[in-house]
């Protein structure tokens, strides 16, 4: 296994070297080295409890690395072998990293209360649940994670049969320490991906694992899906055609890059195809926005105007949508033109670019420049949903 780090895989958060800079650039796992933790030592219960207790303190990185190695070893007899095979099948270059000595007994133990609930019978479930809880900090900031722990962790832990996780220390300082370990550029994130892959390889829990790994939709995203389906039904439009019409021209190329990236992974040959879905785990709204795909508010505005033409009153929900007044006018005009376009067999009419151009002319006048079409910030805040699963 090579130790050369040409690029570090960080859940698509920090891909370096212009991997997605232009429409012709393709994402290639073979250019990325994926560090993988393992252990040469046997795990005993006290070692695991010590590691759990130190999560959130100065020993967090080593403790979580050891816990990842423990779950890998317990899940497959060949230890990291299965994980390595799957990751290599996806095309990654692997670097093997030893977790080293057991956790330092002098480190602080902010999660001691959780560690004390661990016994031989529940150690694997509790540790796995802890790792997946920590993994959420690769997606959510400390404040949002604290809200998640306060509002949803107990219910979710109980539903997953890991009630011990209610003892997880959700102090913001503890969460910040964990987050600093799991942030982009930290090798531990990749070890947690190993846990995800192992779970995917076990048919008994594949459904839960896929729910965890699949790209999650926030409340905003789910609302848009519902609006989109209703609009397609109202218009009698093919969903693909309607989606193309809704993609504002400022975002089309970025959308294509994301689709290309995901297709490359999903179409990987052999066993890798089954695990391609894990690559989308971290593609939340924020990362789509990072590549220019920040049209959620605008598309929602258009969809609600479409549906209002079939169900009077739908547009009342537009009050809280974060778009400018000029765009609200444009959205109404686009909706009107889309209704005209699909008033028939649902497939004829002018293309999206021409339709949007006409709508702009009608709603804003021909003299308005494209400079005012700059994307607006529509970063909706949403809590982690119940689809966050531990196993």
UniProtKB/Swiss-Prot annotation:
Region (Disordered): 346-391
Organism: Infectious hematopoietic necrosis virus (strain Oregon69)
Keyword terms: Capsid protein, Helical capsid protein, Host cytoplasm, Phosphoprotein, Ribonucleoprotein, RNA-binding, Viral nucleoprotein, Virion
UniProt GO cellular component terms: helical viral capsid; host cell cytoplasm; ribonucleoprotein complex; viral nucleocapsid
Subcellular location: Virion; Host cytoplasm
Major location category of this protein: virion
InterPro entries reported in the protein's UniProt record: Rhabdo_ncap_2 (IPR004902)
Superkingdom to which the source organism belongs: Viruses
Biased amino acid composition, Acidic residues: 368-381
Function statement: Encapsidates the genome, protecting it from nucleases. If expressed without protein P it binds non-specifically RNA and therefore can bind it's own mRNA. Interaction with protein P abolishes any non-specific RNA binding, and prevents phosphorylation. The soluble N-P complex encapsidates specifically the genomic RNA, with protein N protecting the genome like a pearl necklace. The encapsidated genomic RNA is termed the nucleocapsid (NC) and serves as template for viral transcription and replication. Protein N binds protein P in the NC through a different interaction, and can be phosphorylated.
Family, similarity comment: Belongs to the novirhabdovirus nucleocapsid protein family.
Name used for this protein in its record: Nucleoprotein
Quaternary assembly: Homomultimerizes to form the nucleocapsid. Binds to viral genomic RNA.
Gene Ontology MF term list: RNA binding
């Amino acid at each position: 296994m090579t130790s050369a780090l040409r690029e570090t895989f960080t859940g698509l958060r920090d891909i370096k070297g212009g991997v997605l800079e232009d429409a012709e650039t393709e994402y290639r796992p073979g250019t990325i080295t994926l560090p993988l933790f393992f252990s040469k030592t046997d795990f005993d219960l006290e070692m695991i409890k010590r590691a759990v207790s130190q999560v959130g303190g100065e020993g967090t990185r080593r403790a979580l690395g050891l816990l990842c190695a423990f779950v890998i070893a317990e899940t497959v007899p060949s230890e990291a072998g299965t994980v390595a095979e799957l990751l290599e099948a996806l095309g990654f270059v692997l670097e093997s990293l030893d977790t080293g000595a057991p956790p330092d007994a002098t480190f602080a133990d902010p999660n001691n209360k959780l560690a004390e609930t661990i016994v031989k019978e529940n150690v694997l479930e509790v540790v796995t649940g802890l790792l997946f809880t920590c993994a959420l900090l690769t997606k959510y900031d400390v404040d949002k994670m604290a809200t998640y722990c306060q509002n949803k962790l107990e219910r979710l832990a109980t539903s997953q049969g890991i009630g011990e996780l209610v003892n997880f220390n959700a102090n913001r300082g503890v969460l910040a320490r964990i987050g600093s370990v799991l942030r982009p550029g930290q090798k531990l994130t990749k070890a947690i991906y190993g846990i995800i892959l192992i779970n995917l390889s076990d048919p008994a829990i594949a459904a839960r694992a896929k729910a965890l790994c699949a790209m999650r939709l926030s409340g905003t995203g789910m609302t848009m899906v519902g609006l989109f389906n209703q609009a397609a039904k109202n218009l009698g439009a093919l969903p693909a055609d309607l989606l193309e019409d809704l993609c504002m021209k400022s975002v089309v190329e970025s959308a294509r890059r994301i689709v290309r990236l995901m297709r490359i992974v999903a179409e990987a040959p052999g066993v890798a195809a089954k695990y391609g879905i894990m690559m989308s785990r971290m593609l939340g709204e924020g990362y789509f926005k990072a590549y220019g795909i920040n049209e959620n508010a605008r598309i929602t505005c258009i969809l609600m105007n479409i549906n209002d033409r079939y169900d009077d009153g739908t547009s009342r929900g537009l009050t809280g949508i974060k778009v400018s007044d000029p765009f609200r006018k444009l959205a109404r005009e686009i909706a009107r033109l889309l209704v005209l376009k699909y008033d028939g067999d649902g497939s004829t009419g002018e293309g999206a670019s021409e339709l949007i151009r006409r709508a702009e002319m009608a709603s804003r006048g021909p003299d308005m420049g494209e400079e005012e079409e700059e994307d607006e910030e529509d970063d909706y805040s949403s809590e982690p949903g119940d689809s966050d699963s531990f196993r």
